[in-house]
């Protein structure tokens, strides 16, 4: 009986001390990767065919850029594109330029109202900003490839995302 009581007490304490990952609201990449979402994250990170030629061109243009990412852990497009984007970010050594990573519910609503304020209609959405001003965004999927789309945005080549008509 004493052992059962100790076991139950230890279980309650352990459960109270662990915080489950909440994919609705703002979270870090580390929190995402250390959660139940790690398997699809790593599978798609490793599967992204990094175009090093384009990454080197992006590198010289990326220094003043900040990126806000709106995603849904429930969304296959987010599961595919967000890890691929982080593979590019890692190649650029630019993790500090990810301004926010925000998880939305299936209605594409954020906990803090920022998704509605930013006009998010599809996920993932990668918003590129310079000096606090949005310069462009990739919505749901790249037009050519993540690397090429990022480069086109940074080179101000009139990039239009899939829903910009």
Positions of predicted regions on the chain:
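N-terminal leader/targeting and pre-domain segments
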Residues: 19-62
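Loop/turn elements at helix/coil->beta-strand transitions in domains of secreted/extracellular proteins
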Residues: 63-66, 97, 131
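Extracytoplasmic/periplasmic, Sec-exported soluble proteins
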Residues: 73-81, 118, 138, 142
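Bacterial Sec-dependent N-terminal signal peptides
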Residues: 1-23
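Structural alpha/beta surface segment adjacent to cysteine/selenocysteine redox centers
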Residues: 111-122
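Thiol-based oxidoreductase modules, predominantly thioredoxin-like and allied folds used
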Residues: 69-73, 96-110
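Local sequence-structure signature of Cys/Sec-based thiol-disulfide redox active-site neighborhoods
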Residues: 59-91
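Non-catalytic, surface beta->alpha helical segment in thiol-disulfide oxidoreductase systems
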Residues: 122, 127-165
């Amino acid at each position: 009986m004493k052992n059962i009581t100790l076991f139950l007490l230890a279980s309650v304490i352990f459960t109270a001390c662990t915080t489950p990952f909440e994919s609705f609201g703002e979270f870090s990449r580390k929190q995402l990767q250390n959660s139940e979402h790690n398997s699809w994250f790593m599978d798609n990170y490793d599967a992204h065919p990094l175009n090093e030629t384009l990454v080197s061109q992006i590198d010289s243009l990326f220094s003043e850029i900040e990126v806000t990412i709106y995603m849904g852990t429930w969304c296959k497009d987010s599961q595919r594109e967000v890890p691929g984007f982080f593979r590019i970010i890692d190649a650029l050594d630019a993790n500090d330029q990810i301004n926010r990573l925000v998880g939305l519910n299936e209605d594409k609503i954020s906990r803090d109202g920022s998704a509605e304020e930013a006009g998010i209609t599809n996920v993932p959405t990668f918003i590129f900003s310079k000096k606090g001003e949005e310069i462009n965004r990739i919505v749901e999927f790249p037009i050519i490839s993540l690397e090429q789309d990022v480069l086109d945005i940074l080179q101000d080549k009139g990039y239009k995302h899939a829903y910009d008509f």
